[in-house]
Regions:
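Small beta-barrel nucleic-acid-binding modules, primarily SNase/OB-fold domains
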Residues: 2-221
Length: 221
């Protein structure tokens, strides 16, 4: 048709590329994978638990942050720091929850991997900052390797929990099935089948291997 100018090739191409990238970005944020949902965080309880606007409690999969005693206003080392970092990441924001095989814990909390709008995983961010350690629990192990890599990054950098590390001495025994480690003197170790026993000379070695401290006999951090 006369009187109309065609856009030049490069200009049309640049505009098309920009629109294409914009659409891809919008798709990545709005598309919700199977087993995932968009939620808004109302309150942060501690370093690994939040309350959603709909009232549900969410416990982050694959990590364990230092405990906070809300009644006494006390906490394990780095407990308040973990809560502050968690709050800075998620409080009041709309995020994406990704579920695994087991969706609720024994307390009725939703078990989830939590993703920020930019795609970063909050579980992973807290490990990278040294404000939590890996807590591998079957069958929810989809990102086990990725989370362990994040913990090792923090350990190498001596970040957070790993900053002023000291070893009290002694030996430790891990359970291949539960991925927990115990003081060698703990009676619980007698229940571990020989084929499932893993010996560690230090707590550092146990954490580096992806084992978490058992609540029995408290090998701790």
């Amino acid at each position: 048709m006369k009187g109309l100018k065609r856009l030049s090739g490069p200009r049309r191409s640049n505009r098309g590329c920009f629109l294409g990238l914009l659409l891809v970005g919008l798709f990545l944020w709005t598309a919700v994978p199977c087993g995932a949902e968009r939620v808004t965080v109302k309150r942060v309880n501690d370093g690994d638990t939040v309350q959603l606007a709909d009232g549900r409690l969410v416990r982050y999969i694959g990590i364990d942050a230092p405990e906070i005693d809300h009644a006494r206003h006390t906490a394990q080392p780095m407990g308040f720091e973990a809560r502050r970092r968690n709050a800075a990441l998620v409080e009041g924001r709309t995020l994406r929850l990704e579920l695994d095989i087991e969706r609720l814990d024994d307390y009725g909390r939703t078990l989830a991997y939590v993703f920020l709008p930019d795609g970063a995983m909050v579980n992973e961010r807290l490990l990278q900052a040294g404000l939590a350690f890996c807590l591998s629990t079957m069958p929810n192990v989809q990102y086990e390797g990725r989370l362990l890599a994040a913990q090792r990054m923090a350990m190498r950098a001596k970040a957070g929990l790993w900053r002023n590390w000291s070893e009290p001495g002694g030996r430790y025994i891990g359970n291949r099935n539960s991925r927990r480690f115990h003081l060698a003197s703990c009676p619980e170790t007698k229940r571990i089948a020989p084929r499932n026993r893993v010996m560690f000379s230090t707590r550092w070695d146990a954490f580096w291997s992806g084992y978490a401290p058992s609540r029995d006999c408290q090998p701790g951090l």
